[in-house]
């Protein structure tokens, strides 16, 4: 009679062990799922940040190009003005 009781206790112990193992595995799975969700959120945020960064850099690039063109035009105007100031009196003197 003690042998069936021992088998029942042994089987119950095995069931308890499997149950504990399953609880641990499910807990780890839920933790991993949470981590994957967090990583997905972070990667989406990084993607949005990269898109905003690219947009901003293109805006700045365009702005700097415009400033460069303006500066070039100002330099050309100053050079032309200087040439006019220098050449016109010389031409008038010889005419």
Curated annotation (Swiss-Prot):
Record family assignment: Belongs to the synaptobrevin family.
Induction (record text): Regulated by the srfA transcription factor.
Lipid bilayer topology: Single-pass type IV membrane protein
Protein name in UniProt: Synaptobrevin-A
Function of the protein: Involved in the targeting and/or fusion of transport vesicles to their target membrane.
Gene Ontology molecular function terms on file: SNAP receptor activity; syntaxin binding
Native source organism of the sequence: Dictyostelium discoideum
Topological domain ranges for the Vesicular compartment: 92-95
UniProtKB keywords: Coiled coil, Cytoplasmic vesicle, Membrane, Transmembrane, Transmembrane helix
A GO CC annotation given for this chain: SNARE complex
Matches recorded under Pfam families: Synaptobrevin
Localisation: Cytoplasmic vesicle, Secretory vesicle membrane
Domain v-SNARE coiled-coil homology, chain residue ranges per copy: 7-67
């Amino acid at each position: 009679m003690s042998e069936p009781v021992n088998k029942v206790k042994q089987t119950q112990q095995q069931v308890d062990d499997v149950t504990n193992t399953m609880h641990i595995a499910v807990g780890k799975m839920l933790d991993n799922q949470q981590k994957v969700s967090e990583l997905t959120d972070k990667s989406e945020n990084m993607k949005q940040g990269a898109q905003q960064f690219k947009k901003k850099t293109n805006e700045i690039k365009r702005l700097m190009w415009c400033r460069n063109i303006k500066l070039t035009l100002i330099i050309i105007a100053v050079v032309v003005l200087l040439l006019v100031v220098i050449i016109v009196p010389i031409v008038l003197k010889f005419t």
